[in-house]
Amino acid sequence: MKFKYHRWFQALVVPLVALAFHIFFGYRVIGRENIPEGGCVVCPNHVQLPAPPFAAVALGGKTPIRLMAKKELFRKKIFAWLIAALGAFPIDREGADITAIKTALGSVRAGQKLIIFPQGTRHAAEGETKKGAAMLAVKTRAPILPMYITEGKRFRCRATVVIGKPFTPDPKQKDYGLIADDILRRIYALKEQV
């Protein structure tokens, strides 16, 4: 079953979630001025806390946000409708998911912010990366926006998101692994600003 993205729903929900995050997590954002106009590939680290909503709220409710999410999250219809309406779309992490890649490319080219976790999973080590974010940035010639989310292992721990300066990888660089490593290095360099 296919579920739709509803920009109006996202614009309504994100500020409410931001308020809840401020109350329950002492949520704060550093570097919001670094968010570029137009489409970009947003690359946060993947943490135990609810990383996708933390990243989306950091971008604010005024910009269209899309998010690649593992297909397993779309198994329950009500939850699938909710996350799709908020901008998520499924990706099969086991193989080349052409539909997800086309959706991602189209989103960035349409001026939307695409959130993609370069580590692919919360269980990846700090140095492990996937190449998808690098490939999308090169193919769209869009800037990459590194983002660091503090790691918290318990409910109601203080949460901080640091948004780094955007950078655009060399479109001639075809070694996506090198770009992916650079993305991860830039993400974890933001840790010092917390």
Predicted segment positions?
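A transmembrane-helix-recognition feature enriched in membrane-embedded lipid enzymes
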Residues: 1-31, 50, 77-86
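Catalytic core of membrane glycerolipid acyltransferases/transacylases, capturing the structured
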Residues: 36-95
